[in-house]
């Protein structure tokens, strides 16, 4: 049980900030479902977040955890984060360079935790194809679908994720959230010998 106030962002718009012919900047309200944003981008031929398909949660949560999957992280696309400062009642914008992004880390999990409410995220996507297929089974799954199109990459990622986790609509689960462990080389080698698959 949680003894406190829980705020859920209600704003769910995706707005064009700029398009220079290659880079497309979008302002995404915090309440947009992350996977809906990925599908929206794929439908419009915009590259950059397709490997983050099927990650549950809202766009406003993406910078907090610096969500990532299959060789891509939210920080790769995020340019700015808009937030409401609880202490001052003002709206602030933080450039990505000041978000303290690291492996599943950000300033929002530490210095700004409990002090701000993320209201929107500005991301940069591209019209230029930039497939990232070098992680695990992604390349094989994409090739089986006919090659590296945005749609094929999204479908491959979704297929891989569905094979690993039950559908939360059928069997409630917390999804996949973890940090890869950092161990000594000898420990990793022993694990690979014991579990080659």
Labelled PLM ranges:
Residues 91-197:
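Phosphate/pyrophosphate- and phosphate-bearing ligand-binding catalytic cores of soluble enzymes
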Residues 1-88:
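Anion-binding (especially nucleotide phosphate/pyrophosphate-binding) glycine-rich loop
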